[in-house]
């Protein structure tokens, strides 16, 4: 077993403090509209330029193992906030440092760390309740655009794109961010259900220019096994041909005689048909086929359910107003499924998302929900250079998550103003705490609430304490607009923060800072001293 180095009490706390401070200093310079960039060296490719707190935090790794523990704990604050709300990572880091630094001063002066932590937790609950009270639901397209603009570092183009995407795909829709090939940042919206499986033969294409197969008022056959022989397949094909409607076939695979028959039918000008492979793999494939069946009002023909392809009839087929199949993907527009069945399916998927502990499963379930309920929007981020593109993509990601958070829990006056407005409520709560150290813990949170505003002001080249006093003396929604160096009504000016982001930042910061304050010992491996390299071999005495 490797020997360990143990630090106790004061020495341990100093090491943690140094680690916390080192990480926080690197992260907090990015806060606010006048926050600076951080350049991160990469082992391959160009350096990364970013203003995203969690990206900076993830790159910090300190040489001293004990200091690194403090840094890693604060890194956890940023990561947890990003996981919960998708934004607010820098605010969370600033709050964590403020709570820990002030708490450490009191622990050193003799306060009981456990009572301090209890006081911190009680104060955070009071502030979170107040945040929920003062938050305002998002009602307009304009407010969504404002939230996204602020989170994208005051980039109105990004803000408007995200608001447009949200409007088109709805609350449950999926917005994905990709890198574009050109300079322009554009929005593509895929309405209806889309999955990445294209036609099995180019002969199915109905438009030679776009190489797409477009089927209007189509029937949809959904089968969970391979189709290779024509014998079992022929009865349903004859029924469809008699109906005069085009047919989309979705199956695990279509090959051999079955595929050849369909292709020959198309070449000879028979009824319009297109065959695609089923999306997904394993159990996920089955679930997606069931989704398509519910969306189109058809049935999944499955031998597990006692159904056979040879017994299939028109009543089992789904229906869609339009189907567009390209070489790479398939889109089903306006499936004719029952609205109640579709809503029940969406609720079932939402429940699975809540119950799932795997991030990957949650992401895949969210994709299914989006495809069923709203559609998919893709924001393609373009820029002149790769470095600029990556920096811009970070901002688009932040803005997207902030917007989703705003729709979920409402909005607050931004720029750190909302936390300042919670100070009077917390001051009124203090006398209710009878334990002196708990009261000190609550006062630590009280003082920390002004830290984000002071940091935004400092990054704008102003004195944070003076700005704080000015904001405290003003009315509810008035705050400091660092971009214009003016005091204004933050809601009217469109300087907004999602309530979920502010709440998550405070909760994560207080949780980790409280744990650090109650830490009395640090255990780390003693780094092994590597032996000096062997001296170079002397020359063999031969001249060339």
Swiss-Prot record:
Keyword Isomerase: yes
Swiss-Prot/TrEMBL keywords: ATP-binding, Chaperone, Cytoplasm, Isomerase, Nucleotide-binding, Stress response
Induction data: By stress.
Keyword Transmembrane helix listed: no
Subcellular localization(s) per the UniProt record: Cytoplasm
Signal peptide positions on this chain: none
InterPro entries in the record: Chaperonin_Cpn60_CS (IPR018370), Cpn60/GroEL (IPR001844), Cpn60/GroEL/TCP-1 (IPR002423), GroEL-like_apical_dom_sf (IPR027409), GROEL-like_equatorial_sf (IPR027413), TCP-1-like_intermed_sf (IPR027410)
Highest rank taxon of the organism: Bacteria
Catalytic activity line of the entry: ATP + H2O + a folded polypeptide = ADP + phosphate + an unfolded polypeptide
GO biological-process terms attached to the record: protein refolding
Pfam families membership: Cpn60_TCP1 (PF00118)
Residues given in the record as ATP binding sites: 30-33, 51, 87-91, 415, 481-483, 497
GO CC terms of this entry: cytoplasm
EC number from the UniProt entry: 5.6.1.7
Homology family: Belongs to the chaperonin (HSP60) family.
Subunit and interaction comment: Forms a cylinder of 14 subunits composed of two heptameric rings stacked back-to-back. Interacts with the co-chaperonin GroES.
Function: Together with its co-chaperonin GroES, plays an essential role in assisting protein folding. The GroEL-GroES system forms a nano-cage that allows encapsulation of the non-native substrate proteins and provides a physical environment optimized to promote and accelerate protein folding.
Stated name of the protein: Chaperonin GroEL
Name of the gene: groEL
């Amino acid at each position: 077993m490797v020997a360990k180095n143990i630090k106790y009490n004061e020495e341990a706390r100093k090491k943690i403090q140094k680690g916390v401070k080192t990480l926080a200093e690197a992260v907090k310079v990015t806060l606010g509209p006048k926050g600076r960039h951080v350049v991160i060296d990469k082992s391959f490719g160009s350096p990364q330029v970013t203003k995203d707190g969690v990206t900076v935090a993830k790159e910090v790794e300190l040489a001293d193992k004990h200091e690194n523990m403090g840094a890693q704990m604060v890194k956890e604050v940023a990561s947890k906030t990003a996981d919960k709300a998708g934004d607010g990572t820098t605010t969370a880091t600033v709050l964590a440092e403020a709570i820990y630094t002030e708490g450490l001063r009191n622990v050193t002066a003799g306060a009981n760390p456990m009572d301090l932590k209890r006081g911190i937790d009680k104060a955070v609950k009071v502030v979170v309740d107040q945040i929920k009270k003062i938050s305002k639901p998002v009602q307009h397209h304009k407010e969504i655009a404002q939230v996204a603009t602020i989170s994208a570092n005051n980039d109105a183009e990004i803000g408007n794109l995200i608001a447009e995407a949200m409007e088109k795909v709805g609350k449950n829709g999926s917005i994905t961010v990709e890198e574009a090939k050109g300079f322009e940042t554009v929005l593509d919206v895929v309405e209806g259900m889309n999955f990445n499986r294209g036609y099995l033969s180019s002969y199915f294409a109905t438009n030679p220019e776009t190489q797409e197969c477009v089927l209007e008022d189509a029937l949809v056959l959904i089968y969970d096994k391979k189709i290779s022989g024509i014998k079992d397949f022929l009865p349903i094909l004859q029924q469809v041909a008699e109906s005069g409607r085009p047919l989309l076939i979705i199956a695990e695979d279509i090959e051999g005689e079955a595929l050849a028959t369909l292709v020959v039918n198309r070449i000879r000008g028979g009824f319009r048909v297109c065959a695609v492979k089923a999306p997904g793999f394993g159990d996920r494939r089955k679930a997606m086929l069931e989704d398509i069946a519910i969306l189109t009002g058809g049935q999944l023909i499955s031998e597990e359910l006692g159904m056979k392809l040879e017994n299939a009839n028109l009543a089992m087929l789904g229906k869609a107003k339009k189907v567009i199949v390209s070489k790479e993907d398939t889109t089903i527009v306006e499936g004719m499924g029952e609205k109640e069945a579709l809503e029940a399916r969406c609720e079932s998927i939402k429940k699975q998302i809540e119950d799932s502990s795997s991030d990957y499963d949650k992401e895949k379930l969210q994709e299914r929900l989006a495809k069923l309920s709203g559609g998919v929007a893709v924001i393609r981020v373009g820029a002149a250079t790769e470095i600029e593109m990556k920096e811009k993509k970070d901002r688009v990601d932040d803005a997207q998550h902030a917007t989703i958070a705003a729709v979920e829990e409402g909005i607050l006056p931004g720029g750190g103003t909302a936390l300042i407005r919670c100070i009077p409520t917390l001051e009124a709560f203090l006398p209710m705490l009878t334990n002196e150290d708990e009261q000190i813990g609550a006062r630590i949170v009280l003082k920390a609430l002004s830290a984000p505003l002071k940091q935004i002001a400092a990054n704008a080249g102003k004195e944070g304490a003076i700005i704080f006093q000015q904001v405290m003396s003003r009315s509810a929604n008035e705050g400091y607009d660092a971009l214009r160096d003016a005091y204004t009504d933050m809601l009217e000016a469109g300087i907004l923060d999602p309530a979920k982001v502010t709440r998550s930042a405070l909760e994560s910061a207080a949780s980790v800072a409280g744990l650090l304050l109650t830490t009395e010992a640090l255990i780390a491996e003693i780094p092994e001293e590597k032996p000096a390299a062997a001296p170079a071999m002397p020359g063999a005495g031969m001249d060339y």
